[in-house]
Design a protein with these regions (language model features):
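Residues at the beta-strand->loop junction immediately N-terminal to the Walker
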Residues: 2
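The conserved Walker
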Residues: 5
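Conserved lysine of the Walker
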Residues: 9
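Hydrophobic positions on the alpha1 helix immediately C-terminal to the Walker A/P-loop
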Residues: 12
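NTP-dependent small-molecule kinase module
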Residues: 19, 123-192
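Conserved nucleotide-sensing/catalytic segment adjacent to the nucleotide-binding pocket
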Residues: 25-77
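A glycine- and Lys/Arg-enriched "phosphate-lid" helix/loop adjacent to the NTP-binding pocket
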Residues: 83-131, 171
């Protein structure tokens, strides 16, 4: 799961994990401590490498450039959220407003909302300028080797989720015959 800041990656990753039963690992929860402080970079890289050695996962977040490209190479499925630039800015702003009342999805507890949001505005522009062209090239190159989903609108994201539900024998509601799984709870991330 990758794309620019404020594109709904954490929400989509959570829904995918719920539907498929795959374990979810939000990188922000691995890369940052409660309150927003970063873990040492080597510690993050070790935990990230341990995640990639697992058989199945949904990983949400960016991490750092080298770990992102390692993750893309290891994944059997790539989900790229590529929304219009203004949508990313708007959704970052909505996240700031909602974050006044509850921690945003995928964020460490007690993260500083204001400074994190200001950083997200900067990241949206930098990602759009530097990474978006590389991401688009990646999905074009990998389309024949991996399952690639290039989602360019909220409607395409909803259609993708619906297709995943159907593929997993689910409709709008959870299949009662399938045991409920709590990704990230039933399976803990590797030790740091």
């Amino acid at each position: 799961m990758f794309g620019n800041a404020g594109g709904g990656k954490s929400t989509l990753a959570r829904r995918l994990a719920e539907i498929t039963g795959l374990p979810l690992y939000p990188l922000d929860a691995i890369q940052f401590r409660a309150g927003g402080g970063k873990v040492p970079h080597e510690e993050y890289l070790k935990v990230h490498a341990d995640l990639l050695r697992r058989d199945q996962w949904v990983i949400d977040g960016f991490g750092c450039v080298p770990s992102a490209w390692e993750r893309f190479a290891a994944a059997d499925t790539l989900v790229y959220i590529d929304l219009p630039l203004l949508t990313h800015y708007w959704w970052v702003t909505k996240r700031l407003a909602r974050g006044q009342f509850a921690t945003p999805e995928g964020w460490p507890e007690k993260s500083p909302m204001w400074s994190s949001t200001m950083g997200s505005y900067r990241v949206v522009w930098l990602c759009h300028r530097s990474l978006t062209p590389r991401y688009r090239q990646l999905v074009a190159e990998q389309a024949s080797a991996k399952r690639v989903h290039h989602l360019k609108s909220p409607a395409e994201t909803r259609a993708f989720l619906q297709a995943v539900q159907e593929e997993n024998g689910l409709t709008r509601h959870r299949n009662p015959d399938r045991p409920a799984r709590r990704p990230g709870v039933d399976e803990a991330p590797p030790e740091r």
